[in-house]
């Protein structure tokens, strides 16, 4: 399993709405994530900095990257553009983090 972590931003006035939209996420999005090998996906909110910290375990980079081209992911990204900064393709602005420590 490959562990990944990344950060995103959420708009200051959208914390509650961001949480509402994720509880629960769309069933079809959950199915796509799972079918593409995502496990133990979690997102944490730092309200003071409007920061989202996400972790996920994936089976392969290729399958994880393929999620972005699915119709449901494209619709989800568009749905989320009013609550967080987005790239021109509507994907959330994010930065991948480098793992520096792991205790199994």
Swiss-Prot record:
InterPro entries: Dimeric_a/b-barrel (IPR011008), L-rhamnose_mutarotase (IPR013448), Rham/fucose_mutarotase (IPR008000)
Disulphide bridges, residue numbers: none
Enzymatic class: isomerase
Pathway named in the protein's UniProt entry: Carbohydrate metabolism; L-rhamnose metabolism
Listed EC numbers: 5.1.3.32
Annotated GO CC locations: cytoplasm
Any GO BP annotation: rhamnose catabolic process
Main location group: cytoplasm
Catalytic activity: alpha-L-rhamnose = beta-L-rhamnose
Subcellular location: Cytoplasm
Sequence positions that bind substrate: 18, 41, 76-77
Gene Ontology MF term list: L-rhamnose mutarotase activity
Active site (UniProt): 22 (proton donor)
Superkingdom of source: Bacteria
Keyword annotations from UniProtKB, A to Z: Carbohydrate metabolism, Cytoplasm, Isomerase, Rhamnose metabolism
Function: Involved in the anomeric conversion of L-rhamnose.
Family indicated by similarity: Belongs to the rhamnose mutarotase family.
Alphabetical list of PANTHER family matching this protein: L-RHAMNOSE MUTAROTASE
Assembly behavior: Homodimer.
Protein name: L-rhamnose mutarotase
Source species of the chain: Escherichia coli O139:H28 (strain E24377A / ETEC)
Classification of source organism: Bacteria, Pseudomonadati, Pseudomonadota, Gammaproteobacteria, Enterobacterales
């Amino acid at each position: 399993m490959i562990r990944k972590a990344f950060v995103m931003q959420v708009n200051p006035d959208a914390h509650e709405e961001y949480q509402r939209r994720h509880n629960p996420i769309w069933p079809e999005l959950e199915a796509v994530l799972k079918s593409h090998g995502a496990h133990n996906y979690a997102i944490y909110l730092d309200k003071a900095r409007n920061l989202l910290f996400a972790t996920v375990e994936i089976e392969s980079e290729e399958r994880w990257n393929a999620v972005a081209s699915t119709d449901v992911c494209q619709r989800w990204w568009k749905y989320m553009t009013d609550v967080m900064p987005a790239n021109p393709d509507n994907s959330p602005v994010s930065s991948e983090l480098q793992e520096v420590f792991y205790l199994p």
